[in-house]
Amino acid sequence: MTKESLNSKKIIKKIEEKSKDIKRYNVKKIGLFGSFAKNKQHKKSDIDIIVTFDKETFDNYMDLLFLLEKMFKRKIDLVIEHDLYPELSYVKKETKYVQL
């Protein structure tokens, strides 16, 4: 998957395909937001992912981040849902959640 060919549908599909691996890190909920979710990305855009863990640990966070960066060969901005500032509540509304 080249950087230029990525779009929201391909990202969501790839996350669904790797759901078994993603669940290994105690992920309860995961979604795509930001430029890719709006299909307004450019070739240097990072991928913005929001996540909720059943068991939130540093290892689960870092291992998920490394997995996602390996999957997409692109920088990932991984945000834990409950850490969002109230001013950024719109992020939850624009997020495209993935069925795990």
Predicted regions and their residues:
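Catalytic core of pol beta-like nucleotidyltransferases
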Residues: 1-29, 37-43, 54-100
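Conserved histidines in hydrophobic membrane contexts and catalytic metal-binding motifs
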Residues: 32
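Short beta-strand->loop micro-motif that forms the acidic, two-metal-ion catalytic signature
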Residues: 48-51
